[in-house]
Amino acid sequence: ESDNFSTDRPLEFLQYDHHQLAKSDFCKFLGTPRSIFYEKSELDKREIAVQNTTPSELIKFMHEDVLDIITPILARIYTVTTPKQETFEIPAIVQTGAKLYEEVSDLNGIAIPCMYYDEIQRKWNNDNRSVLFDMILERFITIEKPHAYLKEAVEKVSETMTSITDYLYGANVYKAIDEHYYSKLRQIDVEQCTWLSDEDIEKCKLRIHEVISQDCESNKPNAEFCIIHNSEEEKHQAIDQILDDICPDNLRFRFTARVDLETDNYIYELKCTSELSLEHRVQVVIYAWLYKILGYPEKTFRIFNIKTGEMLTLDASIEDLSMIMRTVVKGKYTNTKRLDDDEFLQSQETQETQEM
């Protein structure tokens, strides 16, 4: 009633807990009664920013300090399973209607594998819809306000893709959606998607078949297998825990990662380029790291270059994969301090010790 003397105490109802108040006849208790109260951390009180990303986006423009650390590891964890063979003379640069020149190796690398995927998928079912069409549709429906030009381009894509032109145009549309960049799509219209011949396609499909077919005899392979999507919060919990100490307090990553082909024993990433690059290797490392962290069945990851016949196999511990993944993420989204000579030598000694 008052606070004038040491013996004064609050009125009895002021000492009630949630459950007592809920049972009282003088109080209308709203909400759920609680007995235990936790103090919110500063992180809980701040709004968490979400960064949606993909392995392809992570590996763009890697800092030289990042390359200094990961290059020796990459050299150690990849082995050449099949050395380079005859290099196919597949057009990599084409002239557009505007008399400009565009690099199309990336489009070849999408279109040619999808032709093969459709061929083997149709052996298992009667669905004539192309894998590439589904890839385009899946990406397109996630765009909140697609540009009118992009809508028109998607409407031109063939659902069944019965010609080389259909696949090349579909690859161009897919790339535009994936990279949010429409320059190549504007330069190369559907009528200009004619740079690959039937002979080019047949020899490429034969080369893929010689590598993959034996692992597709018992079970249907999964083309464009999704390891994780940025909407899958539960899957990201394990990732958050591992990357927590290198991320800004209010930033969390949400990954979308799809591998080209999953078979009984292998995960394949297919390329169609003159040379497999360091970026290609890092991309597959990120796929493998996500795959292992999420507890998928053990499988071997491979990179196969359709143009040269070269195949690399990844053989890495989770420690190696995590070192590369953490280094790439840290270099991409946090401020990095350039290593001086002593620090760089120390990092190399640490890696050599781990290898022993």
Descriptions of predicted regions:
Residues 1-258:
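Metal-dependent nuclease catalytic cores that hydrolyze phosphodiester bonds in DNA/RNA
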Residues 15-18, 294, 349:
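Generic low-complexity, intrinsically disordered sequence content enriched
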Residues 122, 138, 170, 182, ...:
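A generic signature of intrinsically disordered, low-complexity regions enriched in glycine/proline
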Residues 211, 215, 294, 331-335:
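Solvent-exposed amphipathic alpha-helical surface segments
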Residues 243-326:
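Nucleic-acid nuclease catalytic cores
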Residues 314-346:
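Intrinsically disordered, low-complexity terminal regions enriched in charged/polar residues
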Residues 347-356:
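Compositionally biased, intrinsically disordered low-complexity segments enriched
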